[in-house]
Amino acid sequence: MADHEVYDAIIKLPIGKKPCTLTVVRNGDGTFDGEFTVLGSTAPVTNGKIDEEGNYTADCTITTILGTLEATTEGRIYDGKIDGVAKSRMGVMPIKSEELW
């Protein structure tokens, strides 16, 4: 298995701030695969792109107690932290490492 990076974070959902995890597996060509976990559900991260400064974009479709949600995400991964947003029909939801809140 390729090396993977795990980022524990907080996402601000309409129901409040909730813990989440993003797992990233860099493919070495500016793309990445991964998983996103929130509210006890895990889903694959698709179309992941990341540059040398850690700026990323990706897509995710996850089914939780809130229903099925399609989102595009963008932000930056740096110094072991994540600072980004997920954009979906529920609005823009910040995703940040706990120390960035």
Give short role names for the model-derived ranges.
Residues 1-79, 83-101:
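Central antiparallel beta-sheet cores of small beta-barrel/beta-sandwich binding domains
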